[in-house]
């Protein structure tokens, strides 16, 4: 298990293909996935054995001081299962709007190690609590 950023996700921020200020970012519970920094799309995560079991609403994102943060949220899980990580991804086109197909949804980061991780959700609304310290969701530098 390992937390990590997806290399194409970081490249997406640098090239403007991912925009935390205008696009819709979501968090999803994923189980059965072994992190690969090379993955670019949600469809690659699920194609590598990751099973999505709950997706948050669009995150209320803030970008300041070299960090990306968001309000804590919930994701409704559809079945009880164990050992879920959190997948952060851009669900819309770069300009925002409706969700695009999983084959076009850009993955950004994956978290399965840390306080409260991996998550052991039951059925129903399961909280996602972001770091309130200096690291937030993503910290540059």
Identify the role of each PLM range.
Residues 1-84, 91-141:
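Small cysteine-rich, disulfide-bonded extracellular modules of the LU/uPAR three-finger superfamily
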């Amino acid at each position: 298990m390992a937390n990590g950023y997806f290399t194409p996700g970081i490249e997406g921020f640098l090239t403007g293909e991912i925009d935390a200020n205008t696009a819709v970012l979501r968090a999803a519970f994923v189980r059965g996935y072994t992190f690969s920094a090379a993955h670019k799309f949600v469809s690659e995560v699920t194609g590598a054995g990751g099973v999505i079991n709950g997706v948050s609403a669009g995150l209320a994102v803030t970008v300041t001081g070299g960090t990306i943060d968001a309000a804590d949220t919930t994701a409704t899980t559809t079945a009880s299962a164990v050992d879920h990580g959190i997948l952060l991804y851009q669900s819309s086109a770069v300009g925002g709007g409706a969700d695009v197909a999983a084959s076009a949804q850009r993955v950004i980061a994956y978290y399965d190690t840390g306080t409260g991780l991996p998550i052991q959700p039951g059925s129903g609304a399961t909280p996602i609590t972001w770091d309130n310290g200096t690291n937030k969701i993503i910290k540059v530098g």
